[in-house]
Amino acid sequence: LYVLASHFHPDHFNKEVLDWKTQRPDIIYIFSKDILKHRRAQKEDAVWLKKGEEYADETLSVRAFGSTDVGVSFLIEVENKKFFHAGDLNNWHWMEESTEQEWKGYEKNFLHEVDNLYDYTHELDVAMFPVDPRLGREYMRGPEQFVKRIKTNIFVFPLLDIRGRSRPRCYSEGDQKNA
């Protein structure tokens, strides 16, 4: 069993997962180094990755890519399949609150991180990506830019409602958008 956490925010990391080790001694935790930095876990608790680092064993490999918030995103390769967990990688543009210069800077950072992933792989079997309506009218901008750049067979995203609860969605290649 592998447990990954992309960063220390409570919607992405809960310390209670460390207790699972009592039931599953074979568990391997792979965490972003910012979790250690923010003292949410101890050094001996996990394998710690920052952008550009990789963990590999006989079952899988995990490469850490960047984020446009904190922590990392993960590319997981297992049995010739590629899974991408974006963490908080998104085009956090906040167009309705930011100046044009600010949101274009946010977008540039996002596209740079997507290009870094593209330089490593052009295609994903599954991508898990945050979608947040708080971004306003353009809340799908980041996800659309992502799938336009990187061929993605299945795109899964938690859509946060106005109360912050998650409503997971999944689209396969060829599906029509009908959120």
Residue ranges and their predicted role:
Residues 112-117, 136-146:
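A short, acidic, amphipathic alpha-helical segment used as a generic capping/interface helix at domain edges
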Residues 7-8, 34-35, 67, 86-92, ...:
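Active-site metal-binding loops of divalent metal-dependent hydrolases
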